[in-house]
Amino acid sequence: MSIPQQRVAEQIQSILSTLLLREVSDPRLKQVTVTSVKLDVEMQYATIQVNALGDESRQDEVMAGLDRAKGFLRREVSKRLKIRNAPELNFKW
């Protein structure tokens, strides 16, 4: 990953962590940690690695909650990075 990609990935990770901690009210997404963000070369797709504190049995409900909140999260990332086209967010456990 190039330096600009790395910088944007770090910013996305920080923004998503803050959003999940403070602004998302879905109880399925409590105690979810963003562990890494990887961008493709064109910065159109972001693969976000997440983990939930607690047990692995929450994986399905956490992924369902993230899928439901994906539009909100992408819009907020776009606003906070001040870019027109935020990368598409793909969450992985």
Tell where the protein language model's regions lie, with residue ranges.
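Charge-rich, low-complexity N-terminal segments
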Residues: 1-46, 51-93
